[in-house]
Amino acid sequence: NDQPANEVDWTNCNFVESLDLSGVSLAGAQMSGVNLALANIEKSQINNANMAFGNFIFTNFNNSNLFSTNLQYANCNNANFDNSNLAKVNFEGANLFSSSFIGANLFEVNMTGANITGAIFDEANLSGATWIDGRTCALGSVGTCN
């Protein structure tokens, strides 16, 4: 029953689908195992949060700041991360199937072992990212890992 706030503990919470959390500040929140499928979390501050093993199917993170957030093994199938700051996010082992990262900042993101089948990275900054196969993307990588 905790309201959205910085450092809130929503570990393993199961929210109603299509929840509107646009513009919230959840910096440092504990959300491991949370279910926010189909939620609208656009234009939000979710930096330094723990969202590992969470369910974010079709969740909208458009224009959000997720700097240094842990999304290890999260299910982000068809999620929208367009124009978001994802620098230093840990997507290790995450399901990013058909997710969109158009114009997103993925500087030094960790995608080791992630499923990126069908994901869209148009105009995304991939400089310094650790790619799904463990190689490091060159500085200046945009849209593809060079």
Predicted regions and their residues:
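Tandem repeat scaffolds
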Residues: 1-146
